[in-house]
Amino acid sequence: MLKTPFSRRAAVLMAILAAVAGAALWLQRPDPSRIHIFKGVRGPQAASRIAPTPPATIAEFDRGSDHRLAILVTDPNSGWLGLVRGFRAHGVPVTVTQDPAKALRHRVVLVYPIVSGRVLSGEQIRGLAEHVRGGGTVLAFNLAGGGLEELFGVQAGAELQTRERLRWTASSGVAEEDEIVVSSRGETRIPSIGYANMSARGLATFEDGSTAAACRTVVGQACVLGVDLGALAQRAMNGRAEVISRNYANGYEPSLDVLFRWVRDLYVAGEPTPWIVSTVPAGKEVSILLSHDVDFTRSVENSAAYAEVLKTRGLKGTFFVQTKYVRDYNDEVFFDDRTVPMIKRLVADGMDVGSHTVAHSDAFERMSLGTGKERYPRYRPFVDTLTTVKGATILGELRVSKFLLEDLTGARVTSFRPGRLSYPFDLPQALVATGYRHSSSISANIVLTHLPFQLTDSRGDAALKPVFEFPVTIEDEAAPRLGDRFDAANVVIEKIARHGGVATVLIHPNVTDHKLRFEERLIDHWSGRAWMGSIADFGAWWAARDALETDVVQENGQLALRAASPQALRDVTIQFPKSGRVERLDLPAGGRAAIPLG
């Protein structure tokens, strides 16, 4: 059959396309001078999928006995989820409801975010007043109406976004607790109400002299707090409060903790049988998480010395390993056949091996999410400069590094820390999609708390994710050298220990002199007083503690503590502040306990 001009052109076009495709495949081949190839290693094969998470609802938290702290939500579009996250971190049992009658069955009631005739009926507002006169406690954040000013002893002032500092009238002896930060510029502008004190007991003021917190005793207590605590908690825990913080790292920044502890103390004072779930394992004052960022050529080999320090003291630590199999602007290849046995030794020694990405790029926070099908060795991120990278995605950084560490070293990778603490908004859902459960991606000073907390979808205000953040407290890159600021670090940890907090220590094992001595001294100094170990081990403890359900109920004519634990639980204590009683819980997964309180 004769070829027509059209068929000849088509044949030529097909040949050109085939040549282009062949050239593309050739260009995509691994370059052995830049990329280390592990023979026979390909993966991960399964795709990672971002599953949509429905928004958290008030109904999910509308449960529990009347002995809990009640949060009466008068606007469901407010920051109420921030209150839930904060109180759970602090171990305060809460019931969240939109039903005033149900809330008023509790002795201590938070009305959030507003008290006003626009959101509560006259009868409901009178119910709040009667609750106080009957011996209960009511805390209002925005007392905007309803004729309760005389009861609370204050007169509402202007709502502003320019107040940045709150100072307590009674000193704690700790400067960072006596004056806290509550707002700043840009996205972190948190509205506040400056009250005029008429007959209340003033407890705190803003920098403009207006009253920030006050209580008036009328049989019970009527209190106000002029800070939108829910909104502040959401901004801070979502990593959107950087300009509020007084330090980036290596400091004590308890601003959020101080406010939650103040409300906790109102609950303890006003509830006849209050209880608190401990924030630290039984018998310890503080938790110190020992972590190491392995992101430099010599760091892999040096990690053995750090692991030996831990092992000889019966401890475990976390080693966040960069799976650097591409030579680029940052460094030479150091995740290869020579170093994999060193990482396997860490695993054999019981260390927690976590991911520190593939590229370790400052651009991580600006990367696209990716397809969830990124696979080694085709996934080849290339860092051009300090701030730019080619061929990298968030999912690729997470899934490929996790796959390589697990496949080549036998590690079970559940912990993640990004290079340079670069923190994309899509990270929480990407972590879930790729199988992580513990994140250490931001500094404690930025989030204004020294406790772990649960992450939310897109670092937003709606949906909770099953991943907890363990923010960095002490890091080794600021001046002076880490080994020269041992005393300064201990001052910070001592302040955290006063309240049973968590201190996460970040060390780069690029050297083994002053940094290694720092870790040895730290462990020896806190031996006996602190729980010390890996992020994975503490993360599992914290997640089980967070899932624990506790209640005080009437049982056979007397009060009893009921506990139910979906996960295996050890060394969690329940504190009863008024009696001084402490109950330790050790439960199997699905275990329950009923303890008479007398």
Protein language model regions, located:
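A glycine-rich, often tryptophan-bearing local segment used as a flexible ligand/cofactor-contacting loop or short
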Residues: 118-185, 192, 197, 205-207
